[in-house]
Each structure stands twice: as C-alpha cells, then as structure tokens.
UniProtKB/Swiss-Prot annotation:
This is UPF0181 protein PMI1604. Coiled coil: none annotated. Belongs to the UPF0181 family. Pfam families: UPF0181.
Length: 60
C-alpha cells in the first residue's frame, strides 16, 4: 500500500502526537485518532512536499 504523506517539521509532528493523544483520552480509538489527524494533515499540506510511504501488508 502506498500513501502520500506531507513532510512535517518536528513541531508539527509533536502537535500531531498531542492531538492524537487528546482524541484518545476522550475515548476515540488509536486507529481512528491517527486516521483523523493524518487526513487533516494531508488536507492542510496539499501544496507542500510529500513523501511516499510503503506499508508491507504481508503477515509472514
């Protein structure tokens, strides 16, 4: 699976982590929180440089 993710500064990464932790503290699952924050980041950074991420879905 390939995903385009924007490159983030350390500060942006830290804010994303804090937002995910906050959402989880309010009862959202970790997967949902990560998905929500990732989507927000993609929308916010549509014009910035991005990197391709490859997930190996094989469960050997």
């Amino acid at each position: 699976m390939f995903l385009g993710m924007p490159t983030l500064t350390h500060e942006e990464q830290q804010k994303a982590v804090e937002k995910i932790q906050h959402l989880m503290s309010e009862g959202m699952s970790s997967g949902e929180a990560i998905q929500l924050v990732a989507q927000e980041l993609r929308e916010k950074h549509t014009t910035r440089e991005s990197v391709s991420i490859v997930f190996d879905d094989d469960n050997d």
